[in-house]
């Protein structure tokens, strides 16, 4: 990936030395204006059945050191791609909806395959089946008791804290889901909020914690490769992986005097 580093003043955001640019239309935007424009950029994507997402994740979350394995999001272990928990077998993997499907009303039919938010691969991660159940419908926040099976993960009755190595990954997935799903054409209207224990409302917290995680755990090569792999299938990207700074410009401290962007070269962009 070619990188072009440009120092930008927030009153003007020239995002590109490339033309055309995937993000060209977000220049000079902040707050809800920026989020709404990102929504327009990423809202049209190829949809796949839920069954198909298993194959997408086998590529997107492939262990860089073992092409036969995937990396589990909360445990951090590398296990065989073929150890899929079709019947919730212990120590096998299944698909974790990082934005909980019940907190968005996008439960789908796993037998026949559901489209849209339910099968959006950006929101799905390989996860140990028992840990997926332990996380359940909990919001994200810090603190609680250690999970005995997933080292580095903590939990309370209402919150889940992932291991440090994927805190930023989780935050950027949640930010993507908020920007992507705004209630268009019967889709869920998802909103990241400061509150927790939001029941079945299409809300996910805790916003302030997720903003901290976005900064504490920067984007790495694994996350960038995953974003590109999913783009190859869905033809939409997670903007918060390409530009983590977007999160603060929308929800956080947008008074910074300057930010740095890596300009992403994309194939198949017209």
Put a short name on every predicted segment.
Residues 257-270:
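Residue-level detector of functionally pivotal "anchor" positions at catalytic/ligand-binding pockets or at interdomain
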Residues 3-13:
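Sec-dependent N-terminal signal peptides
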Residues 1-2, 34, 267-269:
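Generic cytosolic/nucleocytoplasmic N-terminal low-complexity/intrinsically disordered segments
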